[in-house]
Regions:
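Concave beta-strand-loop units of leucine-rich repeat
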Residues: 1-35, 39-57, 61, 66-79, ...
Length: 156
């Protein structure tokens, strides 16, 4: 059957060897120094992808990963999530600790984002208006415990 999941917690900087693992369904590349996601672009079987605490900003290699249901992008250098607009199977998106993220327009353009989905926005600079707009789609928007945004679900 081969490998279907990998867990990384090492000092990884180059993920190009992963490009050949096209049947992976779960990948965790947490707390590394990954700056280029291009090798992931062909991993079209991925359902869960965790990329927390790296150093990338460009999400365009994820554009074609249409089977993704869970995507964790916590603690990176993300300012633009436009490539996520076509990931219609996403059910949970974690964007925490991306303080330069100010717009989530791509989520409004994504027809798959809606009732029952979860979007984590703690420690971003997404406006209350955008958070409310997302909540109006039936999305559970998670934000700071003491957020001034009325529609957000507070997390501890």
């Amino acid at each position: 059957m081969g490998a279907t999941g990998l867990l990384f917690t090492n000092a990884v900087t180059d993920i190009s060897p992963l490009a050949k693992l096209t049947k992976l369904v779960d990948l965790n590349i947490h707390t590394q120094d990954i700056s280029d996601l291009t090798p992931l672009s062909g991993l079209t079987s991925l359902i869960e992808l965790r990329l927390a605490a790296n150093s990338f900003a460009d999400l365009s290699p994820l554009r074609g990963l249409s089977t993704l249901e869970y995507l964790e992008l916590t603690g990176n250098d993300i300012t633009d999530i436009t490539p996520l607009s076509g990931l219609t199977n996403l059910m949970q998106l974690d964007l925490r600790f991306n303080p330069d993220l100010t717009t989530i327009q791509a989520l409004f353009e994504n027809p798959g984002i809606g009732a029952g989905d979860i979007v984590e926005l703690r420690h971003t600079n997404v406006s209350c208006a955008d958070q409310a707009r997302l909540a109006e789609k039936g999305v559970e928007v998670r934000t700071e415990l003491f957020s001034s945004c009325a529609t957000a679900t507070r997390q501890r």
